Design a protein with these regions (language model features):
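Structural motif
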Residues: 153-155, 247-249, 281
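A short helix->loop->beta-strand "cap" motif at the edges of active sites that frequently abuts
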Residues: 275-280
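Oxyanion-hole/transition-state-stabilizing segment in secreted/luminal serine hydrolases
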Residues: 211, 228-266, 270-274, 285-290
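Catalytic His-Asp segment of secreted/periplasmic serine-dependent ester chemistry enzymes
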Residues: 290-369
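N-terminal secretory targeting modules
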Residues: 1-186, 358-369
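Active-site-proximal beta-strand/loop segments in catalytic clefts of secreted hydrolases
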Residues: 191-192, 222-225, 249-252, 283-286, ...
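Serine-esterase "nucleophile elbow" of acetyl-processing enzymes
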Residues: 144-146, 152-228, 232-242
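A general structural detector for well-ordered alpha-helical segments in enzyme core domains, enriched
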Residues: 207, 263-267, 298-305
Length: 369
C-alpha cells in the first residue's frame, strides 16, 4: 500500500490558536487618541518643531553621522504614560517601514508593550505583537479585567521608526495624565546597538527599561547601532542634557582601540566640564573576551579613563567590567551571536548596571535634599 503523504502546515497559528495574532480590532465603541497631545505624557523622545518621534534634534543627529541621523528616528527608550478607566486599551500605529532581523524578534524591533503603573511598581500586561505580514502599521488590543482608573505605560519599538501612535479606549472612558517617576530627572545612556536594545524580544526587555521599571526612574536611550563613536557633536549634545546619572556604555563601535583611546577620555572631560555633579558610570564591552587582544585593549582604555577621573579627585565615577557581566557560570547563554544580548543577557546587564545606577541615584537624591 502506498504511503499517504500529509501536508506540512507552515502556519503555526492553525495548529496552536494560542500563537495567533489578531489583525483586526473588531470594536464598535473605540475612540482613538493621538499620544502627541494632552493628557498623554511622552518620555525618552524628542518631538521638536516637526512633531516627529525621534530621540534628539535632527540638526544634532545630522551633524554626527549618517548612521546617527537615520537611527535617531528609531524610538528606543520611548514611552507614553496615561491613566484611564477603560476596560481595554488598543493601539493603532503608523510605520513608514518595518525593519526585519534574522536574530531579533519583531516584537522587540517593531512591537509595543503595555504596563500598569501603581505606586512606582510596573506590572507587565501585554505585548502588542506586529502581524507577520505588517508593512506600514498595525492595530492591536489588550483587554483589562474591569473598569477602574489606572495608570499605564506603553513602551515604543527599539528598532523601528514610528510616524504616528494612537491609543484606543472605550467610548465614554475617562482619560488623564499617568503616574510620574520617583526619579524624574532621566538616567542618560550612550552606546552601541546593545544600548539601543538589540536583540531584546520586547521593548521593555532592554536593560535600561528593566532598570527604569525596577528603580522607578525616567531614562533617555541614546544607543545607536554601529554608530556610537564618541564624535564631538554627540558628546556636546550629551553634555547639554540634564541627567541624574550618565551611563557611558561607549566601547564597541569605535573602529579600533586607537580610536577609542583618542575619544574616550575627551568624552569624559567634555561631559564633566559641563556636568560637575552628575555621576558617571563607565561600562566596558560586555562581549566575553576569548583570545581577543583588541577587546582587552579596549577594556583597559575604559578603565584608564575611570582611573584618571579618580586620580584627579572625581568621586562621582564608577567602572563596570563588561567581561565580568557576561562571564561566570551562565556566560554561554547571554547572547544570540556572541555579541548582542538575548533577554537573559539584558536581565544580567540590568542587574549589574542597575545596582550602580541605584547607588548613584541615591547619592544625588541625598545631595539634593
Amino acid at each position: 500500500m502506498a504511503e499517504t503523504k500529509k501536508k506540512i502546515e507552515d502556519d503555526i497559528a492553525k495548529i496552536d490558536k494560542n500563537l495567533e495574532v489578531k489583525t483586526t480590532l473588531e470594536l464598535d465603541d473605540v475612540v482613538f487618541y493621538d499620544v502627541k497631545k494632552a493628557p498623554f505624557d511622552l518620555y525618552g523622545l524628542y518631538l521638536g518643531e516637526l512633531d516627529v518621534f525621534k530621540r534628539m534634534p535632527e540638526s544634532v543627529a545630522n551633524s554626527v553621522s549618517t548612521g546617527v541621523a537615520s537611527l535617531n528616528f528609531n524610538t528606543a527608550g520611548g514611552r507614553v504614560r496615561f491613566s484611564t478607566d477603560s476596560d481595554y486599551i488598543a493601539i493603532k500605529c503608523v510605520l513608514p517601514m518595518v525593519r526585519n532581523f534574522s536574530h531579533m524578534p519583531r516584537t522587540g524591533s517593531t512591537g509595543f508593550d503595555l504596563y500598569e503603573v501603581e505606586d512606582g511598581t510596573c506590572t507587565y500586561v501585554k505585548t502588542f505583537v506586529p502581524p507577520k505580514d505588517v508593512t506600514d502599521g498595525y492595530e492591536s488590543l489588550a483587554r483589562l479585567p474591569d473598569k477602574r482608573m489606572r495608570s499605564f505605560e506603553i513602551n515604543f519599538p527599539l528598532y523601528n521608526r514610528v510616524d504616528e501612535l494612537y491609543i484606543g479606549l472605550r467610548e465614554g472612558s475617562r482619560i488623564d495624565h499617568g503616574d510620574r517617576y520617583k526619579y524624574d530627572k532621566p538616567v542618560l545612556y550612550y552606546g552601541s546597538s546593545i544600548t539601543q536594545g538589540g536583540c531584546a524580544s520586547k521593548p521593555s526587555n532592554s536593560y535600561q527599561s528593566i532598570i527604569s521599571h525596577d528603580l522607578d526612574c525616567d531614562h533617555i536611550n541614546l544607543g545607536f547601532s554601529g554608530s556610537a563613536k564618541g564624535e564631538k557633536e554627540i558628546v556636546d549634545y550629551l553634555a547639554s542634557l540634564d541627567a541624574s546619572v550618565f551611563v557611558c556604555d561607549y566601547d564597541y563601535n569605535a573602529p579600533n582601540a586607537e580610536h577609542l583611546k583618542a575619544t574616550h577620555l575627551p568624552l569624559y572631560l567634555a561631559y564633566r566640564e559641563k556636568n560637575p555633579d552628575t555621576p558617571i558610570i563607565f561600562v566596558s564591552g560586555v562581549k566575553v573576551i576569548y583570545r581577543n587582544e583588541d577587546l582587552i585593549k579596549r577594556r583597559k582604555i575604559v578603565f584608564d579613563t575611570y582611573m584618571y577621573a579618580k586620580e584627579h579627585g572625581d568621586d562621582l565615577v564608577s567602572f563596570i567590567d563588561g567581561h565580568a557581566i557576561f562571564g561566570g557560570r551562565y556566560g554561554n547563554v547571554y547572547t544570540v551571536d556572541d555579541a548582542h544580548p538575548n533577554d537573559a543577557g539584558f536581565l544580567r546587564m540590568a542587574d549589574v548596571i542597575g545596582r550602580e545606577v541605584e547607588i548613584m541615584l541615591k547619592r544625588t537624591a541625598k545631595k539634593d535634599t
